[in-house]
């Protein structure tokens, strides 16, 4: 079966719209262009600043749906070891992510030559780069090298948590029940405490939907 036949147009459309809203949110939030845009079109870009970030929830729900579809399409427990699946997910994320981080470092170094703006990160240290490479920068308290890299780390954490829950269930009904319990706990407890926002459990309510 070709990859084309596995596409879901509605999912693709939702991701495209959400991506545009997140892009507009970033455009209205960072750098001198954001200030100029908000001065020129205050109503539009104030709205993008306040509400564009909510589109991240669309990505979280879709990512959870696709993870569940791939790992447990019929609601069954995961029968194989979770570690190879988690490693495969890391590699899938890391290759384009590290390339983007490299470009971000170069772009920031060039921008620092001409602009003095707090949105431009300082020169990256080796420890900072290493933390980003292993998707630990949020947890270790390093400054992000780019505005959206927090999501890549959270996506990896969420996939790992979903995989471990489905594997730990070891039975058809127990596995989805574990996902439901953790998602409910996230919605009504962890998601209400911003101190957890660097951890997957903070977002798992949306992911588990």
Language model segments and positions:
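Aromatic-anchored segments of alpha-helical transmembrane domains
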Residues: 20-27, 106, 180-192
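Specific transmembrane alpha-helix
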Residues: 55-72, 151-167, 181-209
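Membrane-interfacial entry segments at the cytosolic side of transmembrane helices
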Residues: 170-178
